[in-house]
Amino acid sequence: MQGTVKFFNDAKGFGFIVEEGNNKEHFVHISGLIDEIREGDEVEFELKEGKKGLNAVNVKVI
């Protein structure tokens, strides 16, 4: 999947990615990152079921 980083807080270690095509927001934790990300970055990611729903994992900048 692809999307855009809407928000990421380095200090707290989490943020949100907006999925391309349907504008769904997905939670991303710092542990799910392959690359460092910043707001506005275009990324590829996978979704994995977490405690509170789907989380973005294996996130890398494209």
Listing of model-derived features with the role each one plays in the protein:
Residues 1-7:
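Structural detector for short beta-strands of small beta-barrel domains
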Residues 33-44:
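Short nucleic-acid-contacting surface segments enriched for D/E, G, S/T with interspersed K/R
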Residues 48-62:
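OB-fold/S1-family single-stranded nucleic acid-binding modules
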Residues 23-35:
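Beta-strand/loop nucleic-acid-binding surfaces
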Residues 12-17:
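Short aromatic-glycine-enriched beta-strand elements
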Residues 2, 25-27, 42:
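Well-ordered beta-strand positions in beta-sheet-rich domains
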